[in-house]
């Protein structure tokens, strides 16, 4: 994969979960992109037309196959994996990536909502955070993948080939957090975050560090995907 030859495909699954810092990073790096909403009834694009696919969060999970958009995303990410198009899965996107690779997605014993430190085996790629978590389900590390990060309650990141799946939201911004907190007041109260006010108060203080960590993660993903693609192309070119 050579950044800039093809655009990045961003799959957005609900209006309140936009690509946020991911788009900011792409613009800063000069990488073209297209945002495709999965709820507007349009046909899913061919992942082969893109340099990589980023799949964002969703109110649904991969097991909600009664939802046409979920089935469509499973097919699209499955096609990307089959065609060796790198996939960056963020929360729901990471769950879908795990599912198509043979992992399991299940209800988490407790939802993770808010800023959380994670245990990471590769801080150069995935810093310890804190990262913004907002999920009620969790994935397992699929067969053949390497678990990179975790909390006590969930696997937080895995990689396999050019693909990276994470359970947290590196793309989140203060504005995105405010939207989620307003919609999930009841869940936040159950977890001791009264009306989301604590979360809203602390998020601006972490904005700069979160942006730096997110850009490091995105850069590392792109570098690994690019190196793998170039090595594969070189190996193919050497065959007679």
Where are these regions (language model features)?
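Catalytic nucleophile loop
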Residues: 79-104
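Residue-level signal for inorganic ion chemistry
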Residues: 26, 91, 221
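Glycine/Thr-rich phosphate-binding loops of Rossmann-like dinucleotide-binding domains
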Residues: 18, 63-64, 98
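Short Pro/Gly-enriched coil loops immediately N-terminal to beta-strands
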Residues: 109-114
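Amide-donor transfer/coupling interface in amidating biosynthetic enzymes
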Residues: 10, 106, 120-240
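Flexible gly/pro-rich beta->alpha loop and the following alpha-helix that scaffold active-site loops
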Residues: 23-88
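N-terminal beta1-alpha1 ligand-phosphate binding loop
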Residues: 8-26, 39
């Amino acid at each position: 994969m050579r950044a800039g030859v093809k655009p990045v495909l961003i799959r957005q699954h609900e209006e309140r979960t936009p690509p946020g810092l991911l788009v900011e990073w792409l613009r800063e790096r000069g990488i073209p992109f297209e945002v495709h909403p999965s709820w507007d009834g349009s046909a899913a694009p061919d992942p082969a037309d893109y340099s990589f696919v980023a799949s964002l969060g969703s109110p649904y999970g991969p097991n909600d196959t009664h939802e046409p958009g979920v089935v469509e995303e499973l097919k699209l990410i499955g096609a990307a994996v089959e065609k060796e198009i790198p996939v960056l899965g963020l929360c729901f996107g990471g769950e879908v990536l795990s599912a198509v690779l043979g992992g399991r997605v299940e209800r988490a014993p407790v939802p993770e909502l808010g800023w959380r430190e994670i245990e990471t085996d590769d801080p150069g790629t995935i810093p310890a955070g804190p990262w913004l978590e907002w999920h009620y389900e969790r994935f397992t590390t699929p067969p053949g993948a390497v678990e990179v990060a975790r909390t006590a309650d969930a696997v937080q990141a895995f990689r396999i080939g050019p693909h990276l799946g994470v359970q947290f939201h590196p793309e989140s911004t203060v504005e995105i957090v405010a939207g989620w907190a307003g919609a999930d007041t009841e869940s936040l109260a159950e977890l001791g975050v009264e009306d989301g006010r604590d979360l809203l108060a602390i998020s601006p203080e972490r904005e700069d560090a979160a942006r730096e960590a997110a850009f490091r993660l995105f850069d590392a993903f792109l570098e690994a995907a690019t190196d793998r693609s170039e090595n594969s192309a070189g190996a193919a070119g050497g065959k007679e």
